[in-house]
């Protein structure tokens, strides 16, 4: 890789930035990440990977490694979610009795499961995979400024960077600002934000302690604490003896993070556990703001926003880090398609069209969960929730990269009864291929996928011809010809009948479908791909 020229420059090595880099590198794109810190964050922060994220990480080739590294599920027992006065005190409400409750809600919708890996364990996996495929990272390197241009050398972005050896310019085709809530990239572009704003202020305490005598045997979990002296949360990390306590404070009452001295934090831990005899070893104490904000624009020319730079999500529901991974995947497959000549630049407009609306769903759901579990006075946000499974797996994309055939304004559908309509995830159907049992979802990724009904041989032939003509990878499968559908569910759930076909994007989203044969299938399919790829 040229030290001063790359295809894509990513600013920020959090989940959004590293996901973008990993998915780009896997597609052969020259990508560089710059991170102002000397290394990745050592703190747990966001934890948990939902099934949609695991679907994407399967495509990225790291899902199995994530599951193997999941120490919370692997060694710390079952996972409960409760509202309580304290960990050993009165239980006010049980949200989930077991990890199996969460699995049961989504298992019929996807072949991917859940994982509970914390951010400090996931980020090194993403970075290693990015490096394996040629991606690079420069720690201790700050973005100072950038400018977009279209000159004799072509269109691009020139970034001024400051690294260990001084300042220098780096030229990139595109720049991705994944530099967090206080994004320099976003602020430099003058992009405002909207949303609920600040919800509360919290102090996070990470501590080590043996709580085997405190927790229920064979159980760990997340506790929303409504203690007479404070309100906050308690939860585990990947390390069995490392835990987190988050306590709310009120600046309007003169409270400050500095008030949470080590002695005070030890007292609060004792109250949270209802176990003053515990002697915790404090690892870190940090103040932070819980907020809900979404950037008004996610793209400005050749510059994009991803992760917390694009939206700040309350941590309730564990969706913030997952949304960052989804941002990275969406942006990566579209940038790669444009850079490799498979798509026109108009495809990049669909990043904001799709991910911004998805962010609104995620933020609304996280707000509703926060209100239900921590702030009942915020009942007005409850009705903005569309449901947790619907937010994760039933969302709908609307953009020029989706050729919808209906005018249904609904933003989501029940993922337990998927429609297979354009804009939604391709439904999970168990099939067999070459004697191997798998899901239709396992067929997606690393290019486009066409699923044809039993009488859809012409669509399969068309996919092969159009793929060669346009230089766009399209893998085609036909029910009854190498793809066995024992429940006869593919045609129904994908809405393609016996003679039709469904075209699925690299991210598993249905781009187009028909339930009929075509007089000239190749011409029809080529027209579809040209439209969705802005060719």
From Swiss-Prot:
Inhibited by phenylglyoxal and 2,3-butanedione. NADP provides a partial protection against inhibition by phenylglyoxal. Increasing the methanol concentration in the assay causes inhibition of the enzyme. It is an enzyme of class 1 (oxidoreductase). It comes from the Bacteria. InterPro entries: FAD-bd, FAD/NAD-bd_sf, RIFMO-like. Keywords: Antibiotic biosynthesis, FAD, Flavoprotein, NAD, NADP, Nucleotide-binding, Oxidoreductase. SUPFAM superfamilies: FAD/NAD(P)-binding domain. Its cofactor is FAD. The keyword Cell membrane does not apply. Monomer. Involved in the biosynthesis of the anthracyclines carminomycin, rhodomycin and daunorubicin (daunomycin) which are aromatic polyketide antibiotics that exhibit high cytotoxicity and are widely applied in the chemotherapy of a variety of cancers. It can use both NAD or NADP but it is slowly inactivated in the presence of NADH. Belongs to the PheA/TfdB FAD monooxygenase family. This is Aklavinone 12-hydroxylase RdmE. It comes from Streptomyces purpurascens.
């Amino acid at each position: 890789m040229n030290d001063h020229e790359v295809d894509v420059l990513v600013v920020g090595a959090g989940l959004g930035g590293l996901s973008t880099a990993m998915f780009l590198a896997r597609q052969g794109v020259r990508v560089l990440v710059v991170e102002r810190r000397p290394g990745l964050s050592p703190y747990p922060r966001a934890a948990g990977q939902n099934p949609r994220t695991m679907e994407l990480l399967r495509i990225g080739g790291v899902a199995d490694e994530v599951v193997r590294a999941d120490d919370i599920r692997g060694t710390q027992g079952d996972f409960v979610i409760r509202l309580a006065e304290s960990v050993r005190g009165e239980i006010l409400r049980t949200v989930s009795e077991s990890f199996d409750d969460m699995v049961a809600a989504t298992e019929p919708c996807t072949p991917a499961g859940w994982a509970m890996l914390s951010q400090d364990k996931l980020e090194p996996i993403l970075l290693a995979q990015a490096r394996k495929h040629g991606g690079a990272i420069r720690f201790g390197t700050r973005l100072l400024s950038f400018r977009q241009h279209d000159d004799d050398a072509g269109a691009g972005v020139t970034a001024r960077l400051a690294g260990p050896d001084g300042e220098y310019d780096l030229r990139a085709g595109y720049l991705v600002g994944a530099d967090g809530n206080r994004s320099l990239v976003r602020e430099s572009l003058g992009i405002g934000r909207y949303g609920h704003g600040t919800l509360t202020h919290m102090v996070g305490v990470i501590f080590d302690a043996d709580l085997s005598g405190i927790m229920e045997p064979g159980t760990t979990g997340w506790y929303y604490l409504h203690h007479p002296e404070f309100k906050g949360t308690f939860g585990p990390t990947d390390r069995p003896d490392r835990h987190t306590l988050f306590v709310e404070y009120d600046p309007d009452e003169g409270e400050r993070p500095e008030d949470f001295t080590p002695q005070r934090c030890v007292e609060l831990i004792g109250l949270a556990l209802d176990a003053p005899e515990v002697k915790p070893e404090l690892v870190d104490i940090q103040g932070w703001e819980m907020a809900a904000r979404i950037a008004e624009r996610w793209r400005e020319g050749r510059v994009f926003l991803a992760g917390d730079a694009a939206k700040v999500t309350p941590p309730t529901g564990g969706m913030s880090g997952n949304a960052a991974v989804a941002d990275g995947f969406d942006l990566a497959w579209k940038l790669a398609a444009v850079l490799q000549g498979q798509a026109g630049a108009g495809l990049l407009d669909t990043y904001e069209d799709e991910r911004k609306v998805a962010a609104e769903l995620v933020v609304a759901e996280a707000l509703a969960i926060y209100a239900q579990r921590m702030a009942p006075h915020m009942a007005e946000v409850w009705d903005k929730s569309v449901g947790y499974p619907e937010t994760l797996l039933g969302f709908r994309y609307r953009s020029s990269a989706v050729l919808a055939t209906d005018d249904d304004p609904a933003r989501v559908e029940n993922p337990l009864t998927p429609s297979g309509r354009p804009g939604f995830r391709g439904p999970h159907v168990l099939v067999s291929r070459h004697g191997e049992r798998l899901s239709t979802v396992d067929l997606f990724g690393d290019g486009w996928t066409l699923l044809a009904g039993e009488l859809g041989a012409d669509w399969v032939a068309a996919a092969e011809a159009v793929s060669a003509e346009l230089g766009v990878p399209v893998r085609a499968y036909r029910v009854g010809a190498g793809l066995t559908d024992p429940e006869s569910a593919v045609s129904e759930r994908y809405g393609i009948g016996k003679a039709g076909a469904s075209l699925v994007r690299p991210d598993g989203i249905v781009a187009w479908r028909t339930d009929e044969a075509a007089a000239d299938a190749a011409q029809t399919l080529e027209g579809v791909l040209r439209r969705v790829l802005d060719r």
